[in-house]
Structure formats: structure tokens, C-alpha cells
């Protein structure tokens, strides 16, 4: 398979003109304050269909022959790529079939259907969905649009690199790119190495699935958009040649970055989109030159957003859950609440447990969920409760 060239990226940019948005690069004073350098955010979460995937999908579909267009397109995806293929196929007036694994997020399934695609369950996992899509190709002659292992897809994603070459300030700097299958990072790297060779390029992967960092997959991650176990030979070769480094962040760091972007930058991003910011906050991208984090997508459903936000607040010490054993008589809970109020913390919920192996007949265990400013505030609150004579057991 031939590696895309700068000319391929320029041709893709011409095809995407008036189709894909030229997403903005935003300055973040808040994140800059944390990392001690100028921070820019490539807000691709504001792209059509909510992610960069529309670039590669449309560039591929726009190059189909008449006979290929008549047979339609097919892909396997549980998320952003499926939506992008569905949208691009609708724009081209051709049929699209998306095979999804069981348990795929319903918001993303519904979005693909809303763009006019036929969505079909393709088995328990992603591999089964791919197998079903390949079988569909054999029986119908449809064109399989791969999420990353296709030069046309890589060239389309690379149009973001052409935009960054113009949008970033002159001189040295660093671009941090989420890496899953490697299509986005490969495309950006091809463009920036040709046009802005002075820039450093850093890839970031989720700790649970980081093959480019030499780690075996160990389980699910909130950054499902970059949870690719087996990258392609083409993208692997490109990234080995063109990336300066690949760093790894865990779900705790990703969730904290997601919350920060939501609260301070007013940007809704998915886990994969928050990974570059997580790498910055964790100090994994040292330097003093300006740094740009690519926010690759913003497709996160409300239920997941609530869960990830709560996880991020808890991991940063802003949600504190404690259990306190108290005598089962009036006024004891009020003492706890008064101590919490004196520390300027907020009580979110209280649960009483009167049954349990370690709970005496005349005792009750009060479990409190508290809102605090940060980890330091949480520790000060626990110390204040202990000073009031309470035996505090921290649960988060």
C-alpha cells in the first residue's frame, strides 16, 4: 500500500473544500497556567459529525468510480468512523451499510441511522463486525471503507495537518495527537513534516491500549476512540518514521482533562479527544515552546459524560466519599454536617447503614458524598472531622 504524499493531502483538501469545516485553533490560558507554556487547542470536536473522521471518509468516497458508487460502501464501526461514512455516503448519494458490534453506544448508532445508513449488528465484538462487513463486500461488491488502513483515508485526515501548518504560530513548537489506528497522526505528520519541519510531533495513547508504545491491551478505556489493538502496517511505518515520541496516559488523567476542558474551555470532548490535554497536564510533553493539543472528537453521550465527569471529579479530589461510625441517636449527623460546613464543603448525599458485621447494635454508619475544592481541601476536611472525634474511613 502506497504512503500518501503532500500532493495527496492537497488534493484531499480541494475535495473537502466547502464540505469539512476548517476547525479553529483556540488559545487556552487556563491550561497554559498549569503547564507553563502557551497552549493551543485544535477544536476538531466542532467538526461535522463531531470528529475528524469525516475528512478521511469523504475523501475516500469522493474518489469512487461510477461502478463502485452503484454498489455502495460498507464499514465496521462502533462510533465516529461509522457516522462519518454514513454522512459522506449521503452527501454522495450512495448507499452505506454500517456493521456495529453488540453494545455499541446507541447515540452513535442512532446518528449513523439518522444520516441514512443501514445499521446492522455484526456480532459480539469489533472483530466480528469487521468479518461481517467483509462478507457483505463479497456478496454485494460494496467498497469497504477502512477506518485508517487506506491511503485515501490517511490523506483526508492529513488535511488537518495542512490547516495546522497555517494556523500555528511561526517557529518551533509541538503538536500532540491522539493515536488509535494511526490514520489521523499519520496524515497530520505527513503534512507537518513537509510544511513545518521545525515542529515536534508527539502521539498519545490510552494506557489500556497502547500498541505503539509497546504495551499489550489490558482492558477497556474511556478513550474508546483510540482503543485499537492492532494498528495497520502502513500507519505503523509512517508513525515510526515521522513521530518524535509516543506517550501514554491513563483513564484518571483523561477524565481530569475532560472535566477541565468542559469547565474552563467550555468544550465537550470525548475521551480520545481529551488524551492530548491529559498528556500535557501529566507533564509528559516537556518544553517551553507553544504546544497544540488536537481535540480529535466530541462524540460522548450524556450518560457516559456524567460517569466520566464524576470519575474525573473524584480522581482530582473534588468528590469525596467517607464513612463515619456514629452512635445511633439524635444530633450525631448534625455534628458531622456542622463540621463539614465549617470547612466550606458541600454535602451532596447522606446514606445510613444500620446493618453490617462491624456495625454495633446502637451504632449507625453514615456514608457521605461531599463536594470539595481539590485534594488538599479533602484532606483538610478529613483532618477536621477527625479533630471532632470522628473515625473517618475514606472511600474515594
Language-model features, listed with the residues they occupy:
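PLP-dependent amino-acid enzyme catalytic core
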Residues: 1-396
Amino acid at each position: 500500500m502506497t504512503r500518501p504524499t503532500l500532493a495527496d493531502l492537497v488534493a484531499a483538501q480541494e475535495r473537502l473544500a466547502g464540505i469539512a469545516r476548517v476547525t479553529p485553533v483556540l488559545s487556552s490560558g487556563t491550561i497554559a497556567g498549569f503547564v507553563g507554556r502557551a497552549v493551543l487547542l485544535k477544536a476538531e470536536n466542532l467538526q461535522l459529525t463531531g470528529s475528524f473522521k469525516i475528512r478521511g471518509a469523504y475523501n475516500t468516497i469522493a474518489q469512487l468510480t461510477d461502478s463502485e458508487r452503484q454498489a455502495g460502501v460498507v464499514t465496521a464501526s462502533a462510533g465516529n468512523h461509522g457516522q462519518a461514512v454514513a454522512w459522506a455516503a449521503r452527501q454522495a448519494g450512495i448507499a452505506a451499510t454500517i456493521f456495529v458490534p453488540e453494545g455499541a453506544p446507541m447515540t452513535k448508532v442512532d446518528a449513523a441511522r439518522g444520516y441514512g445508513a443501514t445499521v446492522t449488528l455484526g456480532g459480539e465484538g469489533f472483530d466480528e463486525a469487521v468479518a461481517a462487513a467483509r462478507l457483505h463486500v463479497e456478496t454485494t461488491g460494496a467498497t469497504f471503507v477502512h477506518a485508517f488502513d487506506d491511503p485515501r483515508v490517511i490523506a483526508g485526515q492529513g488535511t488537518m495537518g495542512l490547516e495546522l501548518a497555517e494556523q500555528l504560530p511561526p517557529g518551533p513548537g509541538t503538536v500532540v495527537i491522539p493515536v488509535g489506528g494511526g490514520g489521523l497522526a499519520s496524515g497530520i505528520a505527513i503534512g507537518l513534516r513537509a510544511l513545518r519541519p521545525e515542529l515536534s510531533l508527539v502521539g498519545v495513547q490510552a494506557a489500556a491500549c497502547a500498541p505503539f508504545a509497546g504495551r499489550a491491551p489490558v482492558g477497556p478505556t474511556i478513550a474508546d476512540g483510540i482503543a485499537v489493538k492492532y494498528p495497520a502496517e502502513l500507519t505503523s511505518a509512517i508513525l515510526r518514521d515521522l513521530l518524535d515520541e509516543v506517550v501514554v496516559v491513563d483513564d484518571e488523567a483523561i477524565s481530569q482533562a475532560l472535566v477541565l476542558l468542559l469547565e474552563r474551555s467550555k468544550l465537550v470532548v470525548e475521551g480520545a479527544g481529551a488524551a492530548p490535554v491529559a498528556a500535557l497536564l501529566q507533564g509528559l510533553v516537556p518544553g517551553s515552546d507553544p504546544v497544540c493539543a488536537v481535540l480529535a472528537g466530541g462524540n460522548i453521550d450524556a450518560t457516559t459524560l456524567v460517569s466520566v465527569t464524576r470519575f474525573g471529579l473524584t480522581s482530582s479530589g473534588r468528590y469525596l466519599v467517607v464513612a463515619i461510625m456514629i452512635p445511633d441517636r439524635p444530633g450525631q449527623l448534625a455534628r458531622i454536617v456542622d463540621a463539614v460546613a465549617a470547612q466550606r464543603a458541600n454535602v451532596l448525599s447522606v446514606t445510613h447503614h444500620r446493618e453490617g458485621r462491624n456495625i454495633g447494635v446502637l451504632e449507625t454508619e453514615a456514608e457521605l458524598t461531599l463536594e470539595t475544592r481539590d485534594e488538599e481541601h479533602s484532606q483538610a476536611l478529613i483532618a477536621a472531622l477527625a479533630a471532632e472525634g470522628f473515625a473517618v474511613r475514606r472511600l474515594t
